[in-house]
């Protein structure tokens, strides 16, 4: 399996598949926000940023999968997936165990050099409450679904990093 993951990390297909899944999740989030009129909270916005990190890592990996740039993509992927797990876990705990003393911020705090909420307010402005349960599917809230998704991204990222020393088998069709 590790050889297979190593082989996949050297090709564009797996990176583009990861980019497609992250983009599909981002578009789904925008659909929930603008069509279903659900209000994203600050943690939702941060989770969205972590997902953009996974998307960016996938695009970097797809650009040059056979060069050392692939390792940069893996580091960004690991960091974004890890932060996504942290954020969605915190968000899940806020929803499962609401407390007046444990709340999220009123607005997202982006660095001064990257004010995403000012540049693209349709995507990055938070207007909801983190503890409010707005949507449920199969008994799970949205942060719980995202927690599973980010855990999957993180597990695959760790396996891909571990697989890097394992070289792919050369398959010779006629056994020479």
Curated annotation (Swiss-Prot):
TM segments? 15-31, 50-65, 72-89, 145-163
Per the UniProt topology annotation, the Cytoplasmic ranges are 1-14, 66-71, 164-176
Source species, domain of life: Bacteria
Give one GO biological process term: protein folding
GO cellular component terms given for this protein: plasma membrane
Subcellular location per UniProt equals: Cell inner membrane
Cystine residue pairs: 41-44, 104-130
Question: Per its UniProt record, what InterPro entries does this chain match?
Answer: DiS_bond_form_DsbB/BdbC, Disulphide_bond_form_DsbB, DsbB, DsbB-like_sf
Classification via SUPFAM superfamilies? DsbB-like
Chief localization class? membrane
Residue intervals on the Periplasmic side: 32-49, 90-144
Keywords of the record: Cell inner membrane, Cell membrane, Chaperone, Disulfide bond, Electron transport, Membrane, Oxidoreductase, Redox-active center, Transmembrane, Transmembrane helix, Transport
Its membrane topology: Multi-pass membrane protein
Q: Does the keyword Transport apply?
A: yes
Describe its function.
Answer: Required for disulfide bond formation in some periplasmic proteins. Acts by oxidizing the DsbA protein.
Q: Say which family it is in.
A: Belongs to the DsbB family.
Name this protein carries in UniProt = Disulfide bond formation protein B
Q: Which organism is it from?
A: Escherichia coli O6:K15:H31 (strain 536 / UPEC)
Organism phylogeny = Bacteria, Pseudomonadati, Pseudomonadota, Gammaproteobacteria, Enterobacterales
- Recorded name of the encoding gene: dsbB
């Amino acid at each position: 399996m590790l050889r297979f993951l190593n082989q996949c990390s050297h090709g564009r297909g797996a990176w583009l598949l990861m980019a497609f899944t992250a983009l599909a999740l981002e578009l789904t989030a925008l659909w929930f926000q603008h069509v279903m009129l659900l209000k994203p909270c600050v943690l939702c916005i941060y989770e969205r940023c972590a997902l953009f990190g996974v998307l960016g890592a996938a695009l970097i990996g797809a650009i040059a999968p056979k060069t050392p740039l692939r390792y940069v993509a893996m580091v960004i992927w690991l960091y974004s997936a890890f932060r996504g797990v942290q954020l969605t876990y915190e968000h899940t705990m806020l929803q499962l165990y609401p407390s007046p003393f444990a709340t999220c911020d009123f607005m997202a705090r982006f660095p001064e050099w990257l004010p995403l909420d000012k540049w693209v307010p349709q995507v990055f402005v938070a207007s909801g409450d983190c503890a409010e349960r707005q949507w449920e599917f199969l008994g799970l809230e949205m942060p719980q679904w995202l927690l599973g998704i980010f855990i999957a991204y993180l597990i695959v990222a760790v396996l891909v990093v571990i697989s890097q020393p394992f070289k792919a088998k050369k398959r010779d069709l006629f056994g020479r």
